[in-house]
């Protein structure tokens, strides 16, 4: 009962983060569930779905399939969908049922690739972890599979060759903002390229915020190699290995950036560009007033905001807390992970003169509603309630 939530809803699950990280890619996504997890993702956790749907399907897993371990039906259905849609990639995404029954998601992906010739990845999400871990797994799988390689070297199978040739004659798919952010077929750029890793709607909320993030990065005089904020192709992921640097804008991008740094020597910069931050220092005028300020959000986003406040001259104590993963290298002495609601309730009781910035639903917690605060909607916490 330690994880019981009385005041806050369940947070976005790891399979949601995995699907969100794949949204910008021409990827056939199969969520291995009975349909509930898929519905939860498209209706509550993916704000882009309302304006632009993707090839994301439920496996419609039946009880007998799960109990008897009948993978053949799932594989056949996936191959049929791949033959029809001819995607550049296939992802088999796990949920609680395959996790509990021990289904070999990676093995299924291997069989699908062997039969189709289309690169396939198995994402061992379980539904028991939160969104940033699923997104991180996907980005690492993509970086491990494609970075430093060439799309032309991908294996071809029974109908994989037809899929590749069909995609080669099609222009890059439209980006979330109506432009083209898929760089695989674009002309070589004279500008240095950078990677933008970890940008998902669970942290940035809207299509407009993701578009603005990419625009802000381009203002620095660079072009994008692999950006998870817009559309991308396996070719873009391949070019990530030659990028000037990786800009990590959330926890979800840290592991993939470290992989690129260790394997290809691509340096990483952790932090959200100031102009793309969910809030600006002026928004805090009159709020802090020498009070300790608690920022509750994704750790990378919250730390970026803290740095902006310090640069603007805010002298009050600034602490970062998160319900989600926190990296030891970014933690300062007053920062802390939020184990459950009681962590924040205890903090409020111990710090009667504090202010906070975070999702509006935090105002439900005892000690938070009557405290000065700034609203920073976090889609992973409150879905689309405040977007």
Please report, for each region that a protein language model flagged, where it lies by residue:
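An N-terminal assembly and electron-transfer interface module characteristic of large anaerobic redox
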Residues: 1-387
């Amino acid at each position: 009962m330690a994880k019981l939530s009385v005041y806050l809803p369940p947070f976005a699950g790891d399979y949601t983060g995995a699907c969100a990280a794949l949204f910008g890619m021409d990827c056939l996504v199969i969520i291995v569930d009975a349909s509930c997890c898929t519905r939860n993702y498209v209706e509550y956790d993916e704000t882009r779905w309302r304006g632009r749907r993707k090839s994301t399907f439920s496996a419609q897993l039946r009880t007998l399939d799960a109990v008897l371990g009948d993978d053949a039906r799932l594989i056949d259905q996936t191959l049929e969908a791949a033959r029809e849609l001819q995607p550049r990639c296939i992802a088999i995404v796990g949920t609680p049922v395959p996790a509990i029954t021990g289904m070999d998601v990676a093995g299924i992906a291997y069989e699908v690739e062997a039969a189709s010739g289309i690169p396939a990845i198995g994402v061992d999400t379980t539904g028991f972890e939160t969104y940033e871990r699923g997104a991180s797994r996907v980005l690492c799988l993509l970086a491990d599979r494609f970075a430093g390689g060439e799309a032309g070297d991908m294996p071809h199978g029974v109908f994989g060759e037809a899929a590749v040739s069909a995609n080669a004659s099609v222009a890059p798919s439209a980006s979330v903002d109506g432009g083209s952010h898929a760089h695989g077929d674009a002309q070589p750029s004279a500008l240095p390229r950078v990677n933008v890793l970890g940008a998902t709607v669970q942290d940035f909320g809207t299509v407009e915020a993701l578009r603005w993030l990419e625009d802000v990065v381009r203002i620095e005089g660079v072009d994008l190699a692999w950006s998870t904020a817009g559309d991308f192709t396996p070719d873009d992921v391949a070019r990530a290995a030659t990028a000037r640097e990786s800009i990590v804008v959330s926890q979800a991008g840290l592991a993939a950036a470290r992989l690129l740094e260790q394997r290809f020597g691509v340096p990483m910069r952790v932090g959200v560009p100031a102009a793309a931050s969910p809030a600006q220092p002026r928004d805090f005028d009159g709020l802090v007033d020498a009070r300790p300020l608690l920022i509750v959000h994704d750790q990378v986003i919250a730390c970026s905001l803290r740095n902006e406040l310090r640069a603007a001259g805010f002298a009050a104590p600034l602490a970062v807390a998160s319900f989600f993963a926190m990296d030891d290298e970014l933690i300062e002495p007053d920062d802390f992970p939020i184990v459950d609601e009681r962590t924040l309730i205890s903090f409020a009781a111990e710090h009667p003169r504090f202010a906070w910035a975070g999702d509006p639903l935090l105002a439900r917690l005892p000690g938070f509603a009557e405290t000065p605060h700034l609203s920073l909607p976090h889609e992973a916490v409150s879905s689309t309630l405040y977007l």
